[in-house]
Every structure is written in C-alpha cells, then in structure tokens.
Amino acid sequence: MINFALLSLIHSADGKISTRAKTPAHFTSRLDLERLHDIRKQADAILVGRNTLEADQMTMTIPGLSPQEQPWRCVITEKGLLDPQHPFFQSAGGSRHIITSSIADLSSFPATIHQFDLAEWLSWLDHETQIETLLCEGGGELVKNLFQLNLVDTIHFTLASHSIFGGQKAPGITGLPGDYLPASRHYHLDILEEGAEGEFFLTYQKG
C-alpha cells in the first residue's frame, strides 16, 4: 500500500525544470546529486516519464547499494517508444517496470510490462504490491498528473538560483502552461537549507 508519494525536482530561479530544448538537468552541484541519492533511499519505487529518462540518460540507481537493495525503477511511456540500448536497460539496479497504455510489443525489453494508464497502475501498486513510498523525478507532465490525482505528499526542490532559462516553451514543475489543476494543492515549507554554489534545498509537506 502506498503511504507516501514524493517529488524530487530541480528548478531554476524562474521556476523552470529544463530549457525549451529539454536539455538534461545537469546544472546543479555534486552536493545536490548526493541529496538526490539520499532521497532515493527513502523510496521503494522511482517513477519517471520517458522524456525525462531520455533527456537525462538516467539509470535510476543509488551508488553503493546492491541490486536487491535498490528501489524499483519505473518508466511511464504513452506510446511505448524506448531505446533498448539506453543506460536504464544496460545497468544493474532495482527491478525495471514499464507502464504504458500503448499496444506496442515491449516483450523483448528486460522489464515487467504493465498495460495500464497512470491511475490504473497506481491503483495496482497500492493494492497488489508492498510498495509504500513512491518517488517521482519528473517530468512536468507526469508531475501535473500526480497533482491532478492529489497524490503528492512531499516535494523536494533544489532551487538553482544561479540559472534562469525563461520562455513559455521551457517547462515548469507541471510542464508547459496549460489547463489549471481541478483545485489548488496546499503545502507548507518544512525544511530550507542552503547548499553549494547558489543552491537551496527545500522540502514541502502537504497540508
């Protein structure tokens, strides 16, 4: 049963999680990367969207932990378009899970395939597994969907005050500008720490 859903995101001084070209989120310090790994250790499963996986060339692993100690590595893809040579499929780590509502044949991939949309998969995760804490690392469209479902309990932000991306086509934490959420979501600032090189680490809790 899922007890907690977490977000871990980096955003620029103007609230953008990437540039308009969707460049990799590699603009923060080593201390921020260490913090990300510490946050991952809180999770039983990590979830990202396909575009984020591709842009950041993610393995979704935690250094120093055996594969048995690693959280599940989960990727959601609407069309089932994945590269079998991606580092995600070539690295040792937690079990791989692909979530897709597509009818694409993904049986050749070294992963468990879930023919669900996001809400269906989350329901399955909640009722059929022992996963208690789910961590989402983006992208913005996936984050917006979780906010729409009102499932986000904790938000970990890294504020990279040294960078400004600008532009309507640079995604914010809920993706590109679009429809409003069905209702406002309310959080309070729980932790604020100064990091390195003009970065600040913030943690928000629901309610």
Write out the residue ranges for each language-model feature:
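Enzymes that bind and transform nitrogen-containing heteroaromatic metabolites
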Residues: 1-207
